Amino acid sequence: IRDRSSLCENMFTTQTFQSVIAVNLKDCTSIEEAIQRSIKRIEGSCISIGYVKPGSVELISRSIGSTHAINSSGDIYFDVVCSAEIFNPRVGDNISCVVEKVNKLGVMAKGEDDLPVCVIIARQHHADSFQECNPDDVIKCEVVGSRFKVKDREIQVIGKFV
């Protein structure tokens, strides 16, 4: 029996990134708590470098707050440096996934072990030997391409059977 949690864990890498956090004075009982709440909001969604694993964001450093004269909202802006577990599949990576639907266009699958991916395996990538599979089958695919937008809850992947 393989360790299912380690398969998903190996897909994430620890990365450090920089961001600007706006803290409104109305929400400010403690500046540290307000900053922590703001950086926790990115967990479980995509940022510019990939999907952020829930519970993995850590604040490394922050600047002193500054205000912008143009902005009348009263927000205080902080430059923060954080580290987090990030998932961003590259071309050639292998992903294990569970088949959801099969139709004449191909296969639609979700990442196994709660991996935040929606995988589409098109028949056009398998002209002669398209592997027949059924819903709930576990398959392995190779990433041909991927895309996501900021705040997406999963990464869309085009794959082919391995």
Roles of regions detected by a PLM:
Residues R2-V162:
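Single-stranded RNA-binding regions, centering on S1/OB-family and related RNA-binding modules
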